[in-house]
């Protein structure tokens, strides 16, 4: 398949790119720097130098693909507007050339849009986003409602992604090596977790299977608590780090709405993803700490 990918150098997008290349798909990626262009071209990727903020930089280049994967995430104050314009641009590009089979558009959301819930939540659960991502469900619906005979659309909601040297779990590993891990709240809340290579496999399945439309959850369904994650990390440190539980109100003073996201208590199920034949290969952070520490260290060395 010919696939247009945004976020190819990001934490999720880079894993998706790896999975697409392993499956021998032809990938065109939107990247922001000449250095990224050179790195991707060396891997056989067609790179488009541009930016989500500048629609003209990629609008024409995005026309005529079999699938579009939007994995980029802007962190600026204008992230809602930038994301909305990117969705509109990719949908327009997908509709530019009629063809069979119909192209697909896969949008990256996240399980935080569900909010906290004591009962397990599957893909049919109502959204209840906090302040941090209050705009995201509307963007999900924009994508889903665009589905037609000429466009297949899907939304993937990753849980907290781990693996490599980026992301929330990697921050815990890094803090553990420095001797202090801070936990927002009492740590008894459950995090929905997913290994980044397993997440990338789901993207490939959704992109390549004709029934891949609608909402898909991406997590291991293991309901691991933050305390269990931290204890697993602590037990594999040469020098046992201190673990400090920070009250949510105190966490908000430094992290704002991000503290509330970290304190969410979520038990999540992914039946629609499993129906595609998808199954995570790694389960729980605490049972995979040695592997994750090695990945973290290798990633740090490459980044140095």
Q: Regions from the language model: what does each represent?
A:
Residues 140-164:
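Conserved beta-loop-beta element that borders a ligand/cofactor-binding pocket
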Residues 174-194:
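A conserved pocket-lining segment of Rossmann-fold NAD(P)-dependent short-chain dehydrogenase/reductase
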Residues 88-132:
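Conserved Rossmann-fold NAD(P)-dependent oxidoreductase catalytic core, especially the SDR/UDP-sugar
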Residues 57, 61-106:
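NAD(P)-cofactor binding segment of oxidoreductase domains
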Residues 3-25:
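N-terminal Rossmann NAD(P)H-binding glycine-rich loop of SDR-like oxidoreductase domains
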Residues 2, 202-258, 297-304:
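Mid/C-terminal beta-alpha module of Rossmann-like enzyme folds, strongest
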Residues 137, 161-173, 206-216, 222:
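Glycine/proline-rich active-site loop of Rossmann-fold NAD(P)-dependent oxidoreductases
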Residues 283-304:
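Amphipathic terminal alpha-helices
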